[in-house]
């Protein structure tokens, strides 16, 4: 019978949909729960690609094995469907984003079924569904009520093409992460979320979770906690100039100060600066640059010296110049920095450009040529008055104590992390459920009025003034204040795409609840997510944002755990043939539909796991796909030769138990490629030995998570389904028995006077007399010893026997 993968895969996909063997049962106390999570996809028009298939298949394998091991498994799927690409498509093609989204979700769903994933299809969520975003809005209202959502006027990242504000995390090397267009700085009033209030906990609680180390490192670096000192300099006009430094030991080396172009002092000093026109021109130029461009270490240093105001050094009392320069960002620290050119290369470059003094305060380098930035803290202080002779490590606490006692400084913990720019001037996002009342200010909608629905608009075109398309909907915008009943206007900004993905894993636990985001019972039963796999590119975006929201929900008693995910792993990218990143422009994008049509879903799944180390990038090879198909053909053909016995073939028992251990361990450690290699080796050996149905029963269960369709079909054909009343995916996972990996018999070489005469099979660890008797029963040995006397027997246990003979 031919292996007809098309018919087989269709048959089992329909059967799984009908019989629902992958349904998760909330509250089942008879089984241990396991919650496996993948990052739900954005349903683009291009459909599912191999970049989705790799992590989805891996988690499907993990969850299928867990079910077979007796766990109550929650493995859900949904769609992160708000966002810019759909809105841009709608603008270009004059079609409502909701229609585009519905079509794309239907296509994705078809593809996910096609690949045989064991999702619980009764728990699908869609972030654009009002019954879902009702609770996204509810969470925002709780943040607002607790003072963690606030509006602030600030310089923001403005995409010149998307015409919307971007979070810092969405700007990559000075361009928009989404469209690649130039990002400039623009002053705008924005809704902000105070993620910085959770900065310490977001770092400290990483110690309590099982995340791969590179994820922890990236999050710690992004949050950027540093212990330092705030020091107060004074301007000659009396204003206080506070700086933050981690190296207060270098205070005697300060020869100038730099202020950010956005600092409010500059506008206040307008009439005191004799070169205001030059300062203002520089400020305007800086506003056109992104934070990335301004912060590049290698860029040429620019700036304007303030004429009319200087700074007074707090320790020496000397007057030092103040410059405005764009490398100082208002969003980090205080927006003012002290220049220590002797020991910071950027400061040295600046001082060199503007002819400023360079003072050595840590001995060891030649500061006339470049900064001496010692990497450790053993350098010796010089030119530093009462710090002279101390090491850097000794000098820091001495200076910190000195500035504190003199009332000009204080210890300070600082973070690189900025509050989250939350609002977007777009249409296709969750409406923000607030109104602005002249009398009451910003007022939240009553919770019984949620969801605030996204209204129909005539055009999704962006306004040139940077306002949302919703701002043109005057009938919708104008409303009444829920607090005083007076006239009010709705907020017309919408939430970013990240909003819906901050809590989707909670909704999976109870997706149809209209009274709460999820019931207390469901949250307590399923929390936390046991294993979350996702892309490294989301480490400082979605992963950080969702941890923040979850901690907030924990604080208000809405969820039972401090952390959302117990374990986080990541995967490498699939590259196109030749090792280049897949892209439409290169014409090297692999469509899973094509592979499935030609080779089958099981082959696709098997290959995408066999292609290389899961955590590393791997190069796609269509030729290599054929190898995975040949392996499945071998399994199919082997099953057709199986003897009608449920006993294991003695020659296969050890092979199978070694394979059970290898596959079980490798799935748990994401070594899917070596698990498959072990099964390939086992199939080759079993083909040589011959198999029984009993042998195949173990092999099919091990292979089922990887290739579920073919294994279900063979399980049924070999009568296991009829005998057990279970599909293969419901059968028990094979249990490893170490004693079975030790062979019961061994083949030993037979020598007569050192010359090879044949082999004999005996029980393992047989004694000399047993082996000798068995050897003498072999024809060639009998002929070689005929008429001879055995004078000595040499036995190498389990390997050989050598009979030393002489004529009688």
Q: Which sequence ranges carry the predicted segments?
A:
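Residue patterns forming the tRNA-binding/recognition surfaces of aminoacyl-tRNA synthetases
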Residues: 2, 15-19, 92-249, 336-456, ...
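N-terminal catalytic cores of NTP/NDP-binding nucleotidyl/phosphoryl-transfer enzymes
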Residues: 25-95, 124-139, 245-246, 313-350, ...
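NTP-handling and nucleic-acid-processing catalytic cores
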Residues: 3-13, 50, 136-363, 467-469, ...
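Helix-rich, typically C-terminal accessory recognition domains appended to large enzymatic cores
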Residues: 80, 145-159, 411-440, 497, ...
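Alpha-helical recognition segments enriched in aromatics with Gly/Pro capping
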Residues: 309-332, 361, 477-616
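Conserved oxyanion/phosphate-binding beta-strand-loop segments in alpha/beta enzyme cores
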Residues: 1-37, 67-76, 100-107, 280-324, ...
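Secondary-structure transition/capping motifs at alpha-helix termini
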Residues: 64-72, 92-98, 110, 114-118, ...
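Glycine- and acidic
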Residues: 39-48, 120-125, 329-337, 381-385, ...
